[in-house]
Amino acid sequence: MFVSVIDFLKGSFFKEKLNNYLCVSMMSLLRVTKRNGELEPVQFEKVTNRIKFLCLGELRDGTKVGDPLDGVCYVTVAQKVIAQITDKITTSALDEDAARFCASKAKDHYHYGVLGGRIIASNHQKGTISNFSKTMQLLYENRKPDGSFYPLIDRRFHKFIARNARRLDDMIDHTRDFRLDYFGIMTLLGGPGKPGYILRRHDGALNVAETPQHLYMRVAVCLHINDFRPLNQVLDSIKETYDMLSLGYYSHATPTMYNAGTHCQQLSSCFLLGIKDTMDATDDINETDTDTEEDGSIPACWTACARISKRAGGIGIGLQPIRSRGTLIAGTGGNSNGIVPLIRVLNMIACYVNQGGRRPGAFALYEEPWCADIFAFLDLKKNTGLEEERARDLFYALWIPDLFMKRLITAIELGDDKRSVMWSLMCPHKCPGLYQTYGVQFEQLYESYEREGRFIHQIPIWDLWEAILVSQKETGGPYMLYKDHVNRKNAQANLGVIRNSNLCAEIVEYSDDQEYAVCNLASVALTSCVDTDTQTQTQTFNYRRLYDICKVAYRRLDAVIDINYYPVRKCKRSNLRHRPVGLGVQGWADVLLMLDLPFEDTVNEERKSTVINPHARELNRKIAEVMYYACVEASTELAAAREQGMSKLRELWIDNKIVFTDDGIDIVSMNGLSEEMQRLVEELRPIEGELNRDSHLGSYSSFIGSPAYQGKLQYHLWGVEPENWDLGDGTILNWKELEQKVSRHGLRGSLFRANMPTASTSQILGNVEANEPYKYAIYTRRVTAGEFVVVNKHLHKELSELGLWIPEIQKQIIKDRGSVQNIKELPLRIRDKYRTAFEVSKKTIQILAAEQGPHIDQSNSQNYFIAQPTNKILTNVHIGAWKLGLKTGMYYLRRESNQQPVQFTVDGGLVVNDKIKAADTGCVSCSA
């Protein structure tokens, strides 16, 4: 039939063609702003090809940056970017939009997150200087807004780089930036309101920033700044460290990554403080000692907290010496206000001295359950109640003696009569010595005070226990640490009774009001030790690689001790004397999935009964053994290497030709020394305590008298004798031989292993935090660009290969809050492997922790994920942890909200809004 021209012009077909023509015409008029500020017309093909090449793992010049990414449609990404182009938009903003869109698609395929990371890496490299030494030079020449010189990096560090610029520049492999996915590289780069790890200089028109590879090289160089070996050996060692960091084999803790090589190298994560129950610097009220640096008073503790928090340190404080409310103060005739007002001052310090303006200060306060103010202590973080009785910005922990747990179990066994078992609340001023003893000695002292009636109150122990559980259900805390377990297995037992842990409950070191313990942290990415057979595509765990990584990581952690800036003299004194470090793990759950292993196997699906997978259990134990063995061996090797030089220095020290202190050498006494002796002093950096003995001159100063000196390593303190075994390449873990080395040479440090939280560094490397299971199969990740939904990459890959990654199953996972347990279409083996942290038995988690324990000489920061905790569930969990001998019973209680999480739509698909109730958002200070 004939169609008139008028009808044709009115038709939808014509309108669609006209709209398309107009859109194309308008788009052709759009311009983009290049990085040099010039404008050029939009070239759609250029936009598409850029994303295409990165998807294929190449740069435009043909440089290979990774494998091709399957499951990713680069055309879709390009179309989305083109649709959002506005006139004069910058090419950098286009890249950011493309990467952000990729991140939003990570729920469809994890490779979108990889593509997003490649886009950001390419964008960042285009806006920075590729040359490492030139970047460091510009950071050194930084100026304040008023024009005054303010270098961002250390002068000595800068001079070393300038002298070795070519060698260091040649070591860097910029393609490794492209290994980081979107969430990892965005965590490194940071953004508005969230500082990243890289150093930046904003100086007028000059905008200088590190690349991730510059960051890793900066850390590597910093850790060798005191290395006095021949230059070629030092540079080889720098490259080894750089390679391990940039390839994701291990990571140093956040403070080390932030501050290495800067003008203030505060590289330590954890500070453990003691306190004395006095407001004065001396017990004599007639004295006027004003040295607040050295006294152990309450104001001295406040000052130390402010100084440490200013430099981004996480703090743990033992409050046990502080007298309870109502106790007489002899010096004034008044009565004590107890611990609450003191804690509120600490709360104000944490808020005011907010880690250099980057984030709130972070303090954890430790108290024992016999404290007369314990109920007020348990209420401090609650949302309700009088403001003058709350301090919600701090974290709280219990330091629990065995006697408390024994009486609690007795009460539970009595059933309805459980309130007949009593517990006495005491004041440390009226009942001295309780916090300074443990085990039988504590029990005898405590019960003698009960018989003498010296307690403040007596209460049913169940009432206190219920108050603890109520606080945990409401706030996620207090942490639970077991005082007697810590001290029976204390590798620093010759120093005294340990009274508290750190901010994240994994560091157990001696501290008091005169010595503040310090710990430097790093974590091994266990995923880097999984090898894939290229022919069979099967995976195996490479124990030899783990061994090598740990030896390197330990040596670098030991180097941190001498490089570090100490905010308080007591911290330096302690760290130089005892030299503890903490090497942990990340990616344990990823390793299990890569090796096709579940945490647990189902033995009866109807009854939902499970047992720990035996292969996972063996892997767990062997990893702990390798890590501890490697660290101890590296430590005794460092001690042996120092012996000859220390012997020469000791002769000079005995003849009074050189003077040392607990802080190092008296510089004046360097005058007149030969060049050889001066070099030895600079290389060995001894303190007086290391010279004041006849043997083990290469070991740390308090080694004599320690359990290790007596032939007892950590596994001996647990009553365990490990067996020798082959790492797979002929390297034998020979424990008796190791003990003989320790006996002969001593140890360079007192402590080696701690499993800390690794929130930030795990996100950078794309691993699950620490040794925790996955929280959900579908979950959210937060970076400066926003909050994005992602899928467990192992689950996505496995279900895709089976043809089961289909919309129906995805929706069921979302409906079940990120769980796959109710999806019967999935094989039982898969449902076992992908149990979430809420679904893995807490008993399994505890047994795995206990079987690592003989080879973790500090502790294990253990969260519990319990969807709806009850008093019965929590009681069983806590008693189970105590019976297994765990030092840290619980870090945080993580629970789901009582309300159904909101399920909202992103790009047409439902996702689960990850709402876990807990008291914190992750510890940055301890993240390693």
Which residues does each PLM region occupy?
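Extended catalytic cores of very large enzyme megasubunits
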Residues: 5, 9, 22-928
